Amino acid sequence: MLQYNTWTIEQQEWNPAEELAIEQQLTFSNDYLCQTAHFEEYYSGAQRLCTYIKGIDTSILNLSAISVRLADERLDLHVWRVEQFYRCLHKNQPLLERHVTVTSPKGHTLKIVARRQLLMDKKECMRLEYEVQSLNYAGPITILSILSTGEDAEQWYPLMNYVGDDLCWTWMQLQPANMQVCSAMNYSLTKNGSPVTQRPIKVEKQDVIGFSMTQKVVPNDTLLLRKHVIVVDSQRFAKEQLIDEALRCLTNL
């Protein structure tokens, strides 16, 4: 059940049977980018990983994608027991906020806080803050910050991918239309407020690019991932300028 207010839409209870419908009802936009309210982390239940650009009716990449793993378990709200759940769309920002406490089949409990925003002053930018706190787990936590294929992956052809030390980008073309999009991403990770400086493992596949980072935690430790993604397209820029423009926007955040 959703609660509608002047500037917010709130969800107080977790109902997996209604998740797909609620994701669509909480769709948000900054008049250039538009996203459904799908979970950032992996979810094995029904969902639509949709991000749209103004003027293109085909979903592009899953810009907000991440993955969270413990030593031998993967965070998945469809499988884990949801102890507490709250989600709120702040329509005037636009910002999607989610607070979740979950317990794995092996009894490990995590507290998740996710804040995903489509910027109004830089409309080509999506910003994500994703916080993972261990409540009773001691061991490694691996977080992947990635760009992955979305709902309409078969309609996009990858032209070029790049994964550096702290940023990555992908350049794609829509088939059969002659439309091109470049998406660039950077990230940072902190543990209990201190920057994590170890070099990540690069992830570079045809349908997924990004970074994998592992930290050992004890109960009450908190990892915070900050992720920025820039999207530019050939409706607004010359195709040969897309990569440079995406990197320029990312640098100027």
Residue ranges and their predicted role:
Residues 1-24, 32, 37-38, 43, ...:
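Acidic/polar, glycine-enriched structural segments that form the non-catalytic walls/loops
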